[in-house]
Swiss-Prot record:
Keyword Signal applies: yes
Family, per entry: Belongs to the glycosyl hydrolase 37 family.
UniProt keyword terms in alphabetical order: Glycosidase, Hydrolase, Periplasm, Signal
Record organism: Salmonella agona (strain SL483)
Entry GO MF terms: alpha,alpha-trehalase activity
Protein name: Periplasmic trehalase
GO annotation, biological process: cellular hyperosmotic response; trehalose catabolic process
Main location (coarse class): periplasm
Assembly information from the UniProt record: Monomer.
GO (cellular component) term, any one: periplasmic space
Catalytic residues, chain numbering: 319, 503
UniProt-annotated binding residues for substrate: 159, 166-167, 203, 212-214, 284-286, 317, 518
Length: 570
């Protein structure tokens, strides 16, 4: 059971109430230890709620170059006491806000710069990074925004000092490739724990991430573990798979055609699909000032509406992209919650198929049939509503205008990745991706240059893997090889020059990290490491594995087990 509430005396509460001039913030109980989760777990509050006006003032004062710094700071005493002191001191002559923060908070430490041994190959460098990126937070400090987890885990790197949901699947691919199945099992166990504790897998293990999830890759994680442990893994995590599905589908039973509820939407024809959603409509604590500035730049929209759409874009993993905006040059035109994403629905199709498989493994044929029926219904809805027949590619659906959107993005490859695409349509997507997104350094996220990081000219490791796997699933091996080879060459050239792997790459050429977005380019980097290892083994034969990218392009991809399109998608 999650440890009990932080108890305070009535006298203390009264004193704080007076100090705050009638403003008393409430605290929910939270765990300082990763204990067995239980149904009476209360949601811990994020720092913007715990610290109220102090949090707002510190972030608006821009005391730190990165707004995430103070969001990750740990109060040294009860936040109510700190707030009371702040109220009493802030108007005094000579008050120094930075000094007050330094006295009352423990700031996150900058990670030590990793200097790899000289002469390492790409594979050796990645294998050497796994222990460097591994963290254990079974116990955390009281009032820390970090949420404890029972097992160790691998973080992305750089400013990302916690585990992230969808990042982790691609990191786990690399861990498995390196033979670290124990770490894969630990990370799956952590996500299962989070589902039991919070009802879903949050964006990351921070209190300020609890109001949203991320692209649902838990089914893929369990399937990966099942490659090593067999159907026992499917049976073990069936309850958590069911809980995650319930989270995404919450409220579907009462929806009428044309209505939406949180993460689920019902179109006019009765088709059920999903969207990204954040339960809160305030600035993100980790990007507080930026979100306030974005909202102020568009006074024609309610700020709360913009905040929720910014948060929901963070839930999508694509924060930010022209994909979510009416005007690619104006972030305040973002409207994530009115868009039905093709990649999200492809992933939920996979979740339904995995639920069917896990139910069958557990001996529940009736449930397996129900999940198969749900998957088939979603596959039909994807083909009906998320296919742009005029352009010839999969795209997002616009709820505001009740029509398919025209923009081609790397998300168009997700139906191929989960084998939910019709074969003729897969061929059209392959041709479109090759013509419009394939660049010298890999697959571009979109063809739009907006200055946002999930747009051109950036390419991201997870999207390269999804594309390569999806194209292979439908026999588009030559295009798959081009994506794989070009991206690996980009990674190798950057590594040769800088001796590191980075979060994203400029794919308009090779050998350059990507730009744009809210923070500087990060290195490490979890998902790039994982995808690079998988791709190295994809282009080199099993009998002669390569430790670095070959200097010449292989004739074809190595034979690897891939998913076969189901009969419904032939």
């Amino acid at each position: 059971m999650i440890p009990p509430e932080i108890r305070r005396s009535v006298l203390l509460q009264k004193a704080i109430k007076l100090a705050l001039a009638g403003t008393l913030l409430t605290f929910a109980s939270f765990s300082a230890t990763a204990a067995d989760p239980s149904s009476d777990t209360e949601t811990p509050q994020p720092p913007d709620i715990l610290l109220g006006p102090l949090f707002n003032d510190v972030q608006n004062a821009k005391l730190f170059p990165d707004q995430k710094t103070f969001a990750d700071a740990i109060p040294n005493s009860d936040p109510l006491m700190i707030l009371a002191d702040y109220r009493m001191q802030r108007n005094q002559s000579g008050f120094d806000l930075r000094h007050f923060v330094d006295v009352n908070f423990t700031l996150p430490k900058a990670g030590e710069k990793y200097v790899p041994p000289a002469g390492q190959s790409l594979r050796e460098h990645i294998d050497g990074l796994w222990p460097v990126l591994t963290r254990s937070t079974k116990n955390v400090e009281k009032w820390d925004s970090l949420l404890p987890l029972p097992e160790s885990y691998v973080v992305p790197g750089g400013r990302f000092r916690e585990i992230y949901y969808w990042d982790s699947y691609f990191t786990m691919l690399g861990l498995a490739e390196s033979g670290h199945w124990d770490k894969v099992a630990d990370m799956v166990a952590n996500f299962g724990y989070e589902i039991d504790a919070w009802g879903h897998i949050p964006n990351g293990n921070r209190t300020y991430y609890l109001s949203r999830s991320q692209p649902p890759f838990f089914a893929f994680m369990v399937e990966l573990l099942a490659q090593h442990e067999g159907d026992d893994a499917l049976k073990e995590y069936l309850p958590q798979l069911q809980k995650e599905y319930a989270y995404w589908m919450e409220g579907v039973e009462t929806l009428q055609p044309g209505q939406q509820n949180q993460r689920v939407v019902k179109l006019e024809d009765g088709s059920v699909l999903n969207r990204y959603w954040d339960d809160r409509d305030t600035p993100r604590p980790e990007s507080w000032v930026e979100d306030i500035a974005t909202a102020k730049s568009n006074p024609n929209r309610p700020a709360t509406e913009i905040y929720r759409d910014l948060r929901s874009a963070a839930a999508s993993g694509w924060d930010f992209s022209s994909r979510w905006m009416d005007n690619p040059q104006q972030l305040s035109t973002i409207r994530t919650t009115t868009i039905v994403p093709v990649d999200l629905n492809a992933l939920l199709y996979q979740l339904e198929k995995t639920l069917a498989r896990a139910s069958a493994a557990a001996g529940d044929r009736a449930k397996a049939s129900q999940y198969d029926a749900l998957a088939n219904a979603r596959q039909k809805a994807i083909e009906m509503h998320l296919w742009n027949n005029k352009e010839g590619w999969y795209a997002d659906y616009d709820l505001q205008n009740n029509k398919i959107r025209n923009q081609l993005t790397a998300a168009a490859l997700f139906p191929l990745y989960v084998n939910a695409a019709a074969k003729d349509r897969a061929a059209k997507v392959a041709a479109a991706a090759q013509a419009h997104l394939l660049q010298p350094g890999g697959l571009a996220t979109t063809s739009v240059k907006s200055g946002q990081q999930w747009d051109a000219p950036n390419g991201w490791a997870p999207l390269q893997w999804v594309a390569a796997e999806g194209l292979q699933n439908y026999g588009q091996d030559d295009v798959a090889m081009e994506v794989t080879w070009r991206f690996l060459t980009n990674v190798q050239h950057t590594y040769d020059r800088e001796k590191k792997l980075v979060e994203k790459y400029d794919v308009s050429s090779t050998g350059t990290g990507g730009g744009g977005g809210e923070y500087p380019l990060q290195d490490g980097f979890g998902w790039t490491n994982g995808v690079t290892l998988k791709m190295l083994d994809l282009i080199c034969p099993q009998e002669k594995p390569c430790d670095s990218v070959p200097s010449t392009r292989p004739a074809s991809l190595s034979a690897t087990p891939t998913k076969t399109p189901s009969a419904a998608t032939q």
